[in-house]
Amino acid sequence: VEHPDAEDFNNAAALPTDPTWFKHAVFYEVLVRAFFDANADGAGDLRGLLGRLDYLQWLGIDCIWLPPFYDSPLRDGGYDIRDFYKVLPEFGTVEDFVDLLNAAHERGIRVITDLVMNHTSDSHPWFQESRHDPDGPYGDYYVWSDTAEKYTDARIIFIDTEESNWTFDPVRKQFYWHRFFSHQPDLNYDNPAVQEAMIDVLRFWLELGIDGFRLDAVPYLFEREGTNCENLPETHAFLKRVRKVIDDEFPGRVLLAEANQWPADVVEYFGDATTGGDECHMAFHFPLMPRIFMAVRRESRFPISEILAQTPEIPDMAQWGIFLRNHDELTLEMVTDEERDYMYSEYAKDPRMKANVGIRRRLAPLLDNDRNQIELFTALLLSLPGSPVLYYGDEIGMGDVIWLGDRDGVRTPMQWTPDRNAGFSKANPGRLYLPPSQDSVYGYQAVNVEAQRDTSTSLLNFTRTMLAVRRRHEAFAIGTFEELGGSNPSVLAFVRQVSEDGDTVLCVNNLSRFPQPIELNLQQWSGCTPIELTGQVEFPRIGHLPYLLTLPGHGFYWFQLTGCEEDA
């Protein structure tokens, strides 16, 4: 099976090497298919995304994260890859992708994408060769067995659709292993040739100029009898190999782990802390997200406090990625059964809103389109420890279309204008890959970029302002996190501080729908003056007594603590 080399293409100009850019970055997840359709065929494409980079630069994001855009039969949203070296034809070509990289880099925006390392599509030439020629060069590229009785301790991830992790292949007359759908056979990482082949894929895109990868489904690369086949030492050893390739050949590029596990397990994916981390630079903090929703619904800071207290220290060169919503369902794997029932009853009253172990909604409808709550959630996302990941459309409060199947309800076209097709495409409306929302509250006539850009008080302009404030204060990106407790359980207060005398930010969040008072012990900052960051208003100087603040329902404050030398 032949594949092209990066030398066959013009490679993109790289941004200056900055080994810590990801710690300061705000990420924006955008589905190529959903953003903008440049060739009027009804689906978004790479040229369309390129034409909308000015909007993303105006909004103030630092890095675009693209889910897979590789050639695929699209039975799992592109996570079933048929050719790692080709772009899905409806999105464009590899040349289009290089043009996108160049245009993004000119605007100071980086681009990362998903790389699915665990499995391929069953239509990938490697798998077809493996089925038809067991003794050939690809015979050992996948995990084959004469029996389906191996690795019985591994859970089934897609409980809605799959009965077993083994599927019988009538051609080879053996079973093949798959942790996800049966049309996604797992690669066999015990075969050194597979490891080399996947490192070649990484090199190809890195040489073209991509800024990094989110490694999809990393815990499952290896299988061992008597284990649950997740987080195995062999998997970590392979990730160290991948990181070494990055460090040696492509410094400044980033690996982001997608490991939907508890924080104590995820920390392992940063690697050896004594070296500052020698595996992935970043990992998503999955359990934090449902607990932000629980804390606000219960009007109590404890769900957030507890999960942050259970989150171990991470290596110096590592960073969490945090998010409120993304292209999947709001995952509830990382909560207890009781908490899951609570979340379903509060946030998914219609059974069509459920998917696998989670809730299939966008941010605004999850929060009943309550502007105060949306602003509070945005403030938490931008101030809690980690690099925030925004999901396209949430900055304008897009809704979901729950009658679309599977996860498509949260993957509808970006709403640019009140015109036909939401300004997303000039195609005949019947040709669109999915219909834009026509809802009376969330439809594109009511919710769109054009209207919100022109309205100073819009959610879009609020989000842009908050991103600008965050960029001015590196405490949000790299500061330590210290929770302050306080007299009122409905209020979450914390300090982010770069160093003893560095940038210091105090964040106070009212998780209740009613106004709340809070008395905070700020003695160690006595003599400082809090300056509110959105309006630059000075608040009373901090003394030795408890500091009283009152907050409106779902209100929040971001303060910079200044002038601390002149101790009271």
Q: What are the functions of these language-model segments?
A:
Residues V1-A568:
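Active-site and adjacent substrate-binding regions of carbohydrate-active enzymes
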